[in-house]
Structure formats: C-alpha cells, structure tokens
From Swiss-Prot:
This is Uncharacterized protein DDB_G0286447. It comes from the Eukaryota. Residues 238-266, 275-353, 423-482 have a biased composition (Low complexity). It comes from Dictyostelium discoideum. The keyword Protease does not apply. Residues 14-41 form a coiled coil. GO terms for molecular function: sequence-specific DNA binding. InterPro entries: CudA-like. Keywords: Coiled coil.
Length: 521
C-alpha cells in the first residue's frame, strides 16, 4: 500500500505539468484566433474603441414634392413622398478618413416626427414599415441610401415621419456609437394626383370686385385723355400751318387778274377736284385736271408773248407766269379771292357744284374712249374677272340705275323714250353760263378801268389791252369737251343720255356687236 501511495505521489507533478501545458496550448490557440481576427478585420477594433460623438450628417434628401407647414408657430419644409416609391438620402462623415463606410452595416428605423426629442418608433407586426439599400462610394466617406416607406401618413393620424439611419457592426450587429443620422420630416401619400388637386378659390368680396372695376375705368380714362391731348396738338399744328399759307396767298397783286381768269375759264371744261376755300394748300403734286390747266396756260401765254408787245407787257406776263405756278400748287382757287369778291364767290360756287362722282365718271368714260377698239372687250373682260363679289354687286346696281334712267333694251338699239319731267339745267350747263358771266364781268371791269384811266400812260393801256386779248384768246383756245358740247341742250333733263340710238361700232361698250359677248354681273 505504501509503495502504491509513493508511486502516486511521484505522478502528481507530471499531471500538473500536463495540465499546465494544456492551458498554455489553449492560450496560444486563443491568441492565434485573435490575431487572425485582427488581420481580417482591422477596422472592427477601431469601431469598438470609438467614442460617443456624432459622426454622420445628412448631405441631401430627395423628394418629388415639398410643402410648407406651420406647426406650433414653427414653419417646416415637409418632404412629400409616395408610398412604396424610392427616394434617396445621402450621408457623409463629419471627419474625413475616420471610418471606412464600406465596412459598416446600416440599419433604418421609421420614427414619428415629434416636437420633443423623443424617438418613438412606428409599430409593426411582421413587415417593417421602411426598407433601405445602402451604396457607399469608393473612398468610404459618403453613402447613398435608397429608402421606401410602406405606410401612409393618413393611417397614423396624419403624423409625419422621420427615418433614423444607424451604422452597425457587420458581425455582432451591435450599433456603433455616434454613427447615425436623421432625415427631414416626411409625409407619405398614396397617389401624386392628391397634390395636383387645386384648392377651391376663395369667393371674392364685393369690395374687391368694385375696386378692380374702378381701377380698370381709371386706366381707360387715362389712355383716352392721352389720345385727346395728342389730337389737340396735331390740330393746333395744322391750324398754324394753314394760317401761314393763307397769309402768303393774300399777298398776291392785282396784276394776276388775267391769269386767274384764264385758270377759271379753263377749269370749266376740265374740272378740278372740289375743295373748300378754307383748306390749306397742299405741297403734293396737283391732279391731272390741274396739270391740263397748267399746259393750257403755258400755251396761251406763249402765244401772247410772240406778239409785238412792249417791255411793260413782258414784265406783266412774267408776273402772271409766276403767279400761275403758285396757283398750280394749291388745291383750290384761293388767288381769285384777292381780285374780286364777286368773281371769287361765283368761281367757288361753280367748283363746289362739281361732284366727285361726276368727275370720276367722266374720267372713266375718257379712259374708255382712249382705249384701242380692238382691246376694249379684253380690258373689260379682265376687269370683270378680277372683280370681287362686292364689286360685282356694285356694278350690277349701277347697271340697274342706268336702265332705270333710260338706257333700256339691248345694246345698239334705240333707247326707250324718257318720261316727261320739268326742264332743269344740268350742272355742266350752269357752270358754262356762270363762267361766261364771269368772263363778261371781267371784260366789263377791264373796260371800266380803261375809261377811268384815260390819263394813264401807254404802258397801262397796253396792259389792259393785253389782258382783254388774253381773255379772248383763252376763250377761243379752250378745247371743246365732248361730254359737255354734245349734251349742252339745256332743255334735256338727262344731258348724258339722249333719245338717239347708238351703235356698238362707234360706242363699243363691251367690244362686240353680238349679244353673246355681253358679260353678266
């Protein structure tokens, strides 16, 4: 027994040594494992040794819409998102190169947006109300997180939400202290059409309506006042120019008596456009009848200057030529008012009696007669083809009036007799008579001047004789107007239409003798 006990005592140190060796081996294995873990994940040790300071901040947050809401006297910008639609949030480190975000796992939590700093999580049963997908950049300083919220604001008593994003240890899933960030306030809706609905406009009060209408009326009155002032200024400028031109016209001498009588007598057969004596003379070129009158004046003055006149008559003719040139630039016979009041009234009455329609009609007839007979039909046909509907109606009405006034039946046949009517003088015949009376009055005035001035010198008598000769020459050299001479019968009530038949060959109205070429309206 003693021997066995001694043997056991001998084995005790060996057993202790074995235990010590086994412990050392276990410690070595533990150290090796720790070294391997440190080699594989060196950043994990740094994360565990981190402090409690906030390391993440919100860089940006996207949303389809935004709203401004005032809660408890504070105005907030609410990010409006659509349920189950993704929106992005970017987070970055406050201190660069502190942690590599590529080695961090992120977790998202949906919280209520409370006025207090209390973090109250949104309850759920199985499905989390928020999902996320993190995408760090290459440097590990910035991370882009895509979020989706699966609950509505209306389902939670119209409360707004906030999302908390927190960094965790990828192995132990423990949160890293200070590595988190909160998003802005979020409102979740079901459809985007909810935001596009227009709010019903407020009803306008009567005061607003009245104020708006009064402002419009005031603006219109202001614009009208501006227009009236502008028109008054233009009228004042025209009246000033008219007074100056009238003063220049009144300075003409009585030596232009014969030249003015020439223009008045020549204007009988070739009428000029009517104008009032108060109108200002225009600086534009005169019309065609006035140009014809000027040609007649130059021809008659050249004929009289070819006679054997003394030096005083030549001076008188030069003065008459200058005065006639001035009278051609005027629009009315203003110079006659400075010679004789009676002659001025008669001439103005004669000019005013000539209507614009008769002048235009005579010009049309004159232009038609000047056409080549072979081209008349084509010209008239072209005019009717190019005429508008309104022009065609006007021409049809004009043709009806011609037929009513006596141009009845087919063209080229005898015209039906006109109904009996009291004889009346036409405007052209009265104009000729008035012009002859004016010439007689001028001649009588010249004869009276010659009788009263018997004691004058030979130059004055020569001038008076030249004036009488000029009047006689002008009366003899005035060409006969075919529209006046052929219808000068004072007893005919319709001087432009006679009872005699007319032939298409001589008066080729529409360019042919057959009725088939007549162009209907």
């Amino acid at each position: 027994m003693i021997n066995n006990f001694d043997q056991q005592i001998q084995y005790i140190p060996q057993f202790q040594q074995m235990q010590h060796q086994m412990q050392q081996q276990q410690q070595q294995q533990m150290q090796q494992q720790q070294q391997q873990q440190q080699q594989q994940q060196p950043q994990q040790m740094q994360i565990q040794l981190s402090t409690h300071e906030e390391r993440l901040e919100l860089a940006s947050q996207s949303s389809p819409f935004e709203e401004k809401v005032t809660l408890n006297g504070l105005q907030k910008n609410i990010k409006v998102v659509i349920k189950n639609s993704p929106f992005n949030v970017q987070l970055r480190l406050k201190k660069a190169n502190e942690i590599d975000l590529n080695c961090v796992a992120f977790e998202s939590t949906l919280l209520y947006d409370c006025d207090t700093n209390e973090e109250k999580e949104v309850d759920f049963v199985k499905v989390k109300p928020v999902e996320h997908k993190a995408s760090p950049n290459e440097t590990g300083e910035l991370v882009n997180i895509e979020l989706r919220i699966k609950v509505l604001t209306s389902q939670h008593e119209d409360m707004f939400f906030r999302v908390k994003i927190e960094g965790q240890d990828p192995i132990s899933k423990e949160p890293i202290k200070g590595l988190y960030a909160l998003t802005h306030s979020i409102k979740v809706i079901s459809k985007p059409e909810q935001l596009k609905k227009k709010q019903p406009p407020k009803k306008r009060t009567w005061n607003d309506i009245l104020l708006e209408s009064v402002s419009k009326i005031q603006h219109q009155q202001h614009e009208q006042q501006k227009l009236i002032e502008k028109l008054l200024q233009q009228q004042a400028g025209l009246s000033g120019s008219t007074s100056t031109t009238n003063n220049n016209n009144t300075t003409t001498t009585t030596t232009t008596t014969s030249s003015n009588n020439i223009t008045s007598s020549s204007a009988i057969n070739l009428p000029s456009p009517p104008s009032s004596t108060s109108s200002s003379p225009s600086s534009s070129p005169s019309s065609s009848p006035t140009l014809v009158n000027s040609h007649l004046l130059t021809s008659t003055l050249n004929n009289t200057s070819s006679n054997n006149l003394n030096s005083s008559s030549n001076t008188l003719n030069n003065n008459n030529n200058n005065n006639n040139n001035n009278s051609n630039t005027s629009t009315s016979n203003n110079n006659n008012c400075n010679i004789n009041n009676n002659n001025n009234n008669n001439n103005n009455n004669n000019n005013n009696n000539i209507s614009g329609f008769e002048d235009s009609f005579k010009q049309m007839m004159n232009a038609y007669t000047q056409l080549d007979p072979r081209q008349r039909a084509e010209k008239v046909r072209r005019v009717f083809r190019n005429a508008s509907s309104r022009d065609s109606e006007t021409l049809s009405e004009l043709l009806d009036l011609f037929i009513t006034e006596g141009v009845g039946g087919q063209l080229g046949t005898a015209v039906a007799p006109l109904p009996n009517s009291p004889p009346r003088l036409s405007n052209s015949s009265t104009q000729i008579q008035n012009s002859n009376n004016n010439n007689n009055n001028n001649n009588n005035n010249n004869n009276n001047n010659n009788n009263n001035n018997n004691n004058s010198n030979n130059n004055n008598s020569t001038n008076n004789n030249n004036n009488n000769n000029n009047n006689n020459n002008n009366n003899s050299t005035i060409p006969n107007n075919p529209f006046m001479s052929s219808h000068s019968n004072n007893g005919d009530p319709y001087p432009f239409f006679s009872n005699n038949s007319f032939d298409n060959d001589s008066f080729n109205s529409f360019g042919g003798s057959s009725n088939s070429e007549f162009i209907p309206f």
